[in-house]
């Protein structure tokens, strides 16, 4: 897997950023926080799950997603967004 696959679209980056800020989110919360439509989010979430970057849990009809921080790639993504969050605060 190439890093380009993970960061191949602004939509995926928005989803990963939101998931790095929260422990777990359902699709409705991701839609609200990213401004992306439900269909686009579903497509990106499916791909990110296939890549092993995020994990899906199902509770009946509810689907919850989280960044897999125990995976080295997920941990690196979390650190990347945390680093940029710190830089953004300094630049303000």
Regions found by a protein language model. Give the residues of each.
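Residues within the DNA-recognition helix of helix-turn-helix
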Residues: 44
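A short, conserved structural fragment
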Residues: 49-59
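A short acidic, leucine-rich amphipathic alpha-helix
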Residues: 29-32
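Short, Lys/Arg-rich nucleic-acid/phosphate-binding segment
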Residues: 58-64, 70
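Short capping segments at the starts of secondary-structure elements
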Residues: 22-26
């Amino acid at each position: 897997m190439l890093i380009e696959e993970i960061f191949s679209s602004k939509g995926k980056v928005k989803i990963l950023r939101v998931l790095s800020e929260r422990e777990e989110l359902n699709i409705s919360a991701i839609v609200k926080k990213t401004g992306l439509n439900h269909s686009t989010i579903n497509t990106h979430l499916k791909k990110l799950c296939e890549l092993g970057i995020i994990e899906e849990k199902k509770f009946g009809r509810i689907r919850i997603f989280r960044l897999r921080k125990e995976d080295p790639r997920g941990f690196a993504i979390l650190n990347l967004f945390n680093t940029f969050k710190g830089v953004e605060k300094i630049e303000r």
